[in-house]
UniProtKB/Swiss-Prot annotation:
Functional note: Contacts the emerging nascent chain on the ribosome.
SUPFAM superfamilies noted in UniProt: UBA-like
Protein name: Nascent polypeptide-associated complex protein
Taxonomic source organism: Methanosarcina mazei (strain ATCC BAA-159 / DSM 3647 / Goe1 / Go1 / JCM 11833 / OCM 88)
Alphabetic keyword roster: Protein transport, RNA-binding, Transport
Length: 120
């Protein structure tokens, strides 16, 4: 690909020459040290990358992160605060279990849970 960059037998590149060429092109590559895990949070789950190797490449002022490791997806569980359950119970006169279920079904939306229980 690059003239004069062939390694032994025309395969691969000399790492020192590669680094020099990248520097000339304005590309800086650094490894982020001592990374234990990387967590990417989405609306539905967390993607956890353990034993992560993170490389940061800077090109023309823009940083790109490359992450390699053991990936697992962890679904988010909806945490319903006790105060919300109590409020739904007071407003609708239902049991704690019914209030909790209504809040789970409404993704924690108090008004939606109360309306659903009131119209049932």
């Amino acid at each position: 690909m690059f003239p004069g960059m062939g390694g032994v037998g025309g395969r691969g590149m000399n790492p020192a020459k590669m680094k020099q060429m990248m520097k000339q092109m304005g590309i800086d590559v650094k490894e982020l040290k001592d990374v234990e895990e990387v967590v990417i949070k989405t609306a539905d789950s967390n993607i956890v990358i353990e034993n992560a190797n993170v490389t940061i490449m800077t090109v023309q002022g823009s940083e790109t992160y490359q992450i390699v490791g053991d990936v697992k997806e962890v679904p988010k569980s909806l945490e319903i605060p006790a105060e919300d359950i109590k409020l739904v119970m007071e407003q609708t006169g239902v049991s704690e279990e019914e209030a909790r279920n209504a809040l789970k079904n409404s993704n924690g939306d108090l008004a939606e849970a109360i309306v659903a229980l009131s119209s049932a």
